[in-house]
Amino acid sequence: MMQTGSVTTPFGRRPMTLALVRRQTALADIKQGKTADKWKVFRDASAAMELLGIQSNSLAVLDALLSFHPETELRQEAQLIVFPSNAQLALRAHGMAGATLRRHIAMLVESGLIVRKDSANGKRYARKDGAGQIERAFGFDLSPLLARSEELAMMAQQVMADRAAFRMAKESLTICRRDVRKLITAAMEEGAEGDWQAVEEVYVELVGRIPRAPTLADVESILEEMWMLQEEIINRLEIRDNSENNSTNAAQSEQHIQNSKPESVNELEPRSEKEQGAKPSEIDRARSEPIKAFPLGMILKACPTIGNYGPSGAVASWRDLMSAAVVVRSMLGVSPSAYQDACEAMGPENAAAAMACILERANFINSPGGYLRDLTRRSELGKFSLGPMIMALLKASGQGTLRFG
């Protein structure tokens, strides 16, 4: 029968802690009749090794301990204390050195996977009754593995999910890096308008921030910024294409007018867009395209000054940023109507972000109100993106030498 209802303290100089007390008392709460396959539990513990704070040698010791339990299943009503000597345990742990063995036993105890059941003299043994059944044993109690079987399974699933997410994020980052690199190269080689050298520097800086051994959080953070850089590049190239198409269409229209014979005075008078046969959806398409909202964290990194004007002197949410933008608007002398127009054209979040950018370079902008109106006008025409402002501020952070406009 399984021994329950008692708390034993470690033999010798090993200290007793309240954590050990809690772990031992929790064993009494194992559900009546509960069972678990010991090797499945071992596989789950192996998968969750890093979360448990143990090492591969710790798993070798745990594997050896489980091999001393005669049954495949861990059962609530069974005897779950194993009592091998250090020599026997070291042999089954592939000849592990004594000092290493003791260190990893301590790690298994500390992680809550096993519990010591020390005898009065520290020896490991079992006392049997007249029928040869184990009456009492001293050694290592495996019942925490049974008690935590569901928890270990969930930890293993989480680790596998994180690994899958990490693989996908790394794959996405690799593809995005390739796309951005080739887009920049194409723009440079084909002489696209714009400061592509600066864009390339942003790309190189992003790649340089990838750690040698990145975590999932590292990859996701860089990937998000790389995606934004890719979108900004595509946006610049699309604006260039649209500008070229508009210039071509305008030239063709002018040539058509010059080659046509007007039949009435009305043909020389300005007409409305509807009179000219233009489709409203085409006219308003640029105005209806929403400006991409950048992550709040990136905006605050590029424009740290805005944080001083948030509620309680900090900006922790988009609502805080919009509140701070209203304060800054008044402080910089931007009229309510100019800011309202910006909110309608860009959206309130992007208008607040634009105010944060203007504040960050207020010393270099002669008329903040006029500057905001210019951004609003460009936004209405579909020719404005926050990307260049934010990327430029990130690059120039601490230098104070950049001008916009």
Curated annotation (Swiss-Prot):
Highest taxon of source: Bacteria
TM regions (residue ranges): none
GO biological process terms, semicolon-separated: DNA replication
Spans annotated as Disordered: 245-286
Keyword Heme found: no
Record has Secreted as a keyword: no
Biased composition (Basic and acidic residues): 268-286
UniProt keyword terms in alphabetical order: DNA replication, Plasmid
Sequence ranges of Polar residues compositional bias: 245-263
Record's function text: This protein is coded by a hairy root Ri plasmid, it is probably involved in its replication.
Protein name per Swiss-Prot or TrEMBL: Putative replication protein C
Organism: Rhizobium rhizogenes (Agrobacterium rhizogenes)
Designated gene of the protein: repC
